């Protein structure tokens, strides 16, 4: 369950290291986000130098890993060791060219197929 002020690791090579959630998109009273949800976030840590994003930038990102377990349709549960997100362009494609770490299969249902194809492991 990702909410306002939650810290997320960045699972791509855009140069950002961590994000702070400003808002979970999808309704005026939406409080929590889960796997596959899009959030508006601020870059809190970034790699120094010429990276795609800088500290203080406001970006859109999709949640790809969450420590809160998510129930699947077959009755199993999936959870990860950290909360992570991938920074998006306005057309919902990833801004980076590489994805680090596993991502959830739920992203395929949410039409983030480009992230699925770049990920080294889909769980």
UniProtKB/Swiss-Prot annotation:
Q: What are the BP-aspect GO terms?
A: translation
The record's listing under InterPro entries reads: Ribosomal_uL14, Ribosomal_uL14_bac-type, Ribosomal_uL14_CS, Ribosomal_uL14_sf
**Alphabetized CDD domains for the sequence:** Ribosomal_uL14
UniProt keyword annotations, A-Z: Ribonucleoprotein, Ribosomal protein, RNA-binding, rRNA-binding
In terms of domain of life, where is this protein from? Bacteria
| Annotated GO CC locations | cytosolic large ribosomal subunit
Which range is the signal sequence, renumbered to this chain?
A: none
GO MF terms, alphabetically ordered: large ribosomal subunit rRNA binding; structural constituent of ribosome
Which family is this protein grouped under? Belongs to the universal ribosomal protein uL14 family.
The entry's function note states: Binds to 23S rRNA. Forms part of two intersubunit bridges in the 70S ribosome.
Q: Whom does it interact with, and what assembly results?
A: Part of the 50S ribosomal subunit. Forms a cluster with proteins L3 and L19. In the 70S ribosome, L14 and L19 interact and together make contacts with the 16S rRNA in bridges B5 and B8.
Q: What is this protein called?
A: Large ribosomal subunit protein uL14
What organism is this sequence from? Tropheryma whipplei (strain Twist) (Whipple's bacillus)
Q: Which gene encodes it?
A: rplN
